Amino acid sequence: MARQLDEQIAGRFPVGQRLRVLDVGMGRGVQALRLARAGHSVTGLESDAELLRVAREALATEPEGIRERVKLIEGHGRETGVHFLPGSFDVVLCHGVLMYVEEPDPMLAGLARMLAPGGLLSLLVRNADALAMRPGLTGDFGAALEAFDSATYTNDLGLTVRADRLDALRATLAGIAAPLHAWYGIRVFTDNTADGTELPADELERVLTLEDRAGRTDPYRGVAALLHLCGVRG
């Protein structure tokens, strides 16, 4: 997904411009730190105190120049209007968050308001149109059948959470003046690969290239476990 995000940024903003980035639900800060290393000014918003602690510890190991470009705040994505003025950011990330938000539309509208005109909204969501794929490919055919009629699933933490449909999000983004500009599939072939699986460098590069190509290509991207959507503020 980092390749796709970098591609969207490079295609939308002048080379060398220091962007104002808001990472909502930043988790351990992986994307926030990566973008700060690339020269951008990054604000991370995280509601989980433990994840925020881990992100702060990771930030503390970075060189001073990078630390100065990162601000970490405890808070929820629904609270962006409390912390920031409208139009404060060029890029807003919301990756792996919407599945935990029962009614995501108001939050998405708030995120769109944070963008300056022409700004980029990057979402990573679970693909509700492909929930049958994981259980079906692991032989749990009963669960696969049930998934066709559901927009919820049980995640790796054992929590029942939401998934989103592409068409519904397309309509939502249009309605909040950040229409869909591009979308990709994530984890087309690797959704059942165990977290932490280590591969030789050459094999890892092949996997990343395969996933990147599949995530841009129909019909593969439509059955990906996750969707990466990029909206642009009008």
Q: Which role fits each region the language model picked out?
A:
Residues 182-234:
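A C-terminal cap/extension of S-adenosyl-L-methionine-dependent methyltransferases
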Residues 105-120:
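A short glycine-rich, Lys/Arg-flanked "PGG" loop and its adjoining helix->strand segment in the class I
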Residues 30, 34-80:
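Class I SAM-dependent methyltransferase SAM/SAH-binding core
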Residues 158-177, 183:
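Short alpha-helix
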Residues 1-17:
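Conserved alpha-helix/loop element of class I SAM-dependent methyltransferases that forms part
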Residues 93:
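A conserved beta-strand element that flanks and buttresses the S-adenosyl-L-methionine
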Residues 17-25, 120-149:
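Conserved class I S-adenosyl-L-methionine
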